[in-house]
A protein has these predicted regions:
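N-terminal lobe of the biotin/lipoate ligase/transferase fold
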Residues: 1-108
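Short loop/edge segments at beta-strand edges and connector loops
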Residues: 29, 116-118
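Short, basic and Ser/Thr-rich N-terminal targeting/leader segments
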Residues: 46-48, 118, 127
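Long, positively charged amphipathic alpha-helical accessory segments at protein N-termini or as interdomain linkers
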Residues: 1-7, 86-114, 124-170
Length: 170
């Protein structure tokens, strides 16, 4: 059965558009956190290149223990399972590479001028557009970088309105 994403895309369709077979797409309509889902799958042996997407996160994670809100239809929430063969001292580069890729992708697709706010945010006009959180397995045998991109948010709470933005608002 094909997994629908926002009634327009499906996991199978995304998979077919990729130029490589390295990535395997998995989709659920709602999860507590794509990072939690990916970590659970990694612990059960998910291979390098497994991608976990959800339309809604009920308990998305941000850096420093903060929550990341992603109500239905408002964001891209995605986590990967990576099993890289790199030195521990270079693992922090994964977050930077994810951020650069997101910033470039957003700019290429939308024309929005984006930048990186070290170490894990993509910003537009000084406001956060995207956040990245990379977690490591307990034995260091896998990484789970997660990314949340604010896409269709039309407003933010008063305490976030001067700090956050979305593709829609830009």
């Amino acid at each position: 059965m094909e997994e629908e994403i926002n009634s327009h895309l499906s996991a199978d369709r995304i998979q077919s558009m990729l130029r490589t077979d390295r990535w395997t797409i998995h989709y659920r309509e709602s999860v507590d956190s794509t990072n939690n889902w990916a970590r659970q799958e990694a612990e059960e042996g998910a291979p390098d290149g497994s991608v976990y997407l959800a339309d809604t996160q009920t308990a998305g994670k941000g850096s420093r223990g903060r929550s990341w809100g992603s109500p239905e239809g408002t964001s891209i929430s995605m986590s990967l399972v990576l099993r890289p063969e790199i030195e521990m001292s270079r693992i922090s580069m994964i977050t930077l590479v994810m951020g650069l890729g997101a910033a470039d992708g957003i700019r290429d697709v939308t024309g929005i001028d984006t930048g990186i706010k070290w170490p894990n945010d993509v910003v537009c006009r000084g406001k956060k557009l995207c956040g990245i959180l990379t977690e490591m397995g307990p034995n260091g045998d896998y990484l789970v970088p997660g990314i949340g991109i604010n896409v269709n948010m039309d407003r933010f709470s008063r305490d976030l309105s001067d700090k956050a933005t979305s593709v829609f608002l830009e």
